[in-house]
Amino acid sequence: MIRAALLLVLAAVGCATVLPGPRVDASVAPSPAQRWIPPQPLPASRPPEPDPALVAQIKPGMQVTLQQLLAYALSNNPQTRSAWLNARAAAAGATSRRSAYYPSVELDVQAGYTHQSFAKGALTFDQWALTPSAQLTWLLLDLGGRSADVEEADRLLQAANLNHGAAIQDLLLLVEQGYFQYQGAKALLTAAQASVKEAQTAYQAAEERRRAGVATIADVLQAKTQLSQAVLAQQQAEGNVATVRGALATSLGVSATLPVDVADLPERLDVQPLGETVDKLIERAESQRPDLARARAQALAVASRADSISSRGLPKLVLGANASRSYYLDEPWVHGDNYSAAVTLQIPIFNGFKDTSDLLQARELAKAARADTETLEQQVILQVWTSYQAVKTAEKRVGSAQDLLAAAQQSSEVAQGRYKAGVGSILDLLTAQSALANARAQDVQARANWLLAIASLAHDTGTLGPPAGEARP
């Protein structure tokens, strides 16, 4: 027997020295200068399919309203879906923590064979047995550990739900920003097209005057330059419209290639002054911002974790019970029963300062979480202040831009009439047309910026919500 064991050990040692070690060359790139190529192409995820209800709205001449876009995005965007699923997972985790208050019951079935020999084999004993058993373990008292764990799980669930609310508000702002930016881009394109037409009119007028001998080739070239610049601006505006439209479609959770169309930017806005002071808006944000409430819940969860760790060093009272029956298969109808029950008092003494270190770590993390919450509170105040000032500025710019546009239109009309009458220069006409193009752009940007500022302020104060009474498109 000893010789056989020695031979087995020597064989194992020999295999260890002969067998090759682990090789990694085939699993990584050949060199630092070459990229790794997977042996098989990774499966590509399918692009999201737009909902038929939304596709029905995407037809030539049909425009989707902001309420329809918001309702569709809420039900289709993967970011809000991910936040909702995380909240459901947190709810399951909270339920799991409560299981510590219930007893644990386990059922085992053991089948075995026993051979014993005595007096150098003169007496032997062989037996087959089948033994089912049941064990019960129940933590009766732990002086706060389970309650702290449940409190932590509840706070994490609260934070997950608030994170879902923050994701909804972020999505609503993203869609509204895309919607208003799309409207603004379309309005800028319309303004650029009008500038091209006016530049063409000026170019034709310069050509006619040159043929009549009352204008020079320099006038024609200046008008041609103005026309080329207007065409370039129009082409840039067309590209911006396509880009912003793709961003809006992406915010809905569909492909950027979906040809979404929306209504034009309103020519006149009912600009109403803000009815609340910035202090009131900040107070509202501090009480309604879901991301701020989420940070507070996470800080409380970390504090509960510290309470749970501190309870590890306290005594625990555990109830244990066991019942089993052994059936001896070589002797039918013969069995043996075992029953036991005990209440155990567990008192931790020493574990290498692990609990002390874990508690210190948890308490420092709790302090850091509170500091992060304070930082976020300051950021929220700054965001509300910035959005408030943006709205106030946008209110003024809307009126000023309209006055600028009206004056520029009159100036352009006068300059065009004077040039055709032969009493004005081409430079005066081109200058007036350039000022008109700039005034159109300023007017469009002022209107779009006011709408964007209102949406941002609603988001920053935590009051931006889904449309009421709107069905999915």
Regions found by a protein language model. Give the residues of each.
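C-terminal structured "cap/appendage" subdomains that terminate the fold
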Residues: 418-421, 431-437, 444
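Terminal intrinsically disordered/low-complexity segments used for targeting and assembly
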Residues: 1-72, 238-284, 458-473
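A small-residue-enriched
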Residues: 16-36, 71-141, 173, 245, ...
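A short glycine-centered flexible hinge/capping loop motif at secondary-structure junctions
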Residues: 210-214, 419-423, 460
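Sec/SRP-type N-terminal targeting helices
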Residues: 81-82, 98-99, 140-168, 218, ...
